[in-house]
C-alpha cells in the first residue's frame, strides 16, 4: 500500500522527468532552427559591439542577404533586411537575459532569413560560453576589442579579460 510519502516521491520524480523531457525537446528544436540559418555571426568585446553589429548587418544587407541583426543594451534593437525601420527587442517579464536568443532565432527562421548578426549580451564568461555554444552557435565570431572594463566579472587583469 502506498504511503503518502511514497506518492509525493513518485510525483516529484514524474515532475523532474517531465521538465527534463521538455528541456531536451526544446534544445532539439532550437538546434534544428539554428541549422536553418546558414550564416550566424556573434559580435563580442567590451566597447563598440552595437556599431560593428550594425556595420556587418549593413554590409550583408547591401550584398542581398536576407539578414537580421540584433543589438543589445538599454536600447536593444532588431534590424530587418526588408525595412529601414528598427524595432525594439520585446522582452519577457524577467527582463534581458541570454535566454531571449531562443526567441530571436525563432523570429529569424520565421522570417526566412539566411543570416543573423547578433551582438553578444553576456558579460559573465560562463554565460558567454553558453551564448555561443548553445544559443547562437555562430560560424563566425568577431571580437571587437579587449579593454580593462567589467573587471569585477571578467577578471582582475587584461589577460583575464582576453
Feature map (PLM): residue ranges:
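Short, basic phosphate-binding NTP loop
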Residues: 1-44, 51-55, 61-63
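Catalytic cores of large soluble enzymes that bind and process phosphate-bearing ligands
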Residues: 9-16, 48, 93-97, 153
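ATP-dependent carboxylate-amine ligase catalytic core
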Residues: 31-36, 58-141, 145-162
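Short polar catalytic/cofactor-binding loops
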Residues: 46-48, 73
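Short N-terminal binding/cap micro-motifs at the start of the first secondary-structure element
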Residues: 49-52, 77-79
Amino acid at each position: 500500500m502506498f504511503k503518502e510519502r511514497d506518492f509525493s516521491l513518485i510525483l516529484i520524480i514524474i515532475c523532474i522527468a517531465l521538465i527534463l523531457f521538455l528541456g531536451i525537446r526544446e534544445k532539439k528544436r532550437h538546434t534544428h532552427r539554428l541549422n536553418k540559418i546558414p550564416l550566424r555571426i556573434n559580435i563580442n568585446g567590451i566597447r563598440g559591439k552595437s556599431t560593428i553589429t550594425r556595420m556587418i548587418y549593413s554590409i550583408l544587407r547591401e550584398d542581398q542577404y536576407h539578414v537580421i541583426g540584433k543589438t543589445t543594451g538599454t536600447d536593444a534593437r532588431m534590424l530587418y533586411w526588408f525595412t529601414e525601420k528598427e524595432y525594439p527587442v520585446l522582452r519577457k517579464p524577467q527582463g534581458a537575459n541570454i535566454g531571449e536568443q531562443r526567441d530571436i532565432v525563432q523570429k529569424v527562421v520565421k522570417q526566412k532569413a539566411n543570416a543573423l548578426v547578433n551582438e553578444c549580451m553576456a558579460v559573465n564568461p560562463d554565460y558567454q560560453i553558453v551564448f555561443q555554444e548553445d544559443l547562437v552557435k555562430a560560424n563566425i565570431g568577431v571580437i571587437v576589442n579587449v579593454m580593462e572594463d567589467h573587471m569585477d566579472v571578467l577578471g582582475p587583469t587584461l589577460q583575464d579579460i582576453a
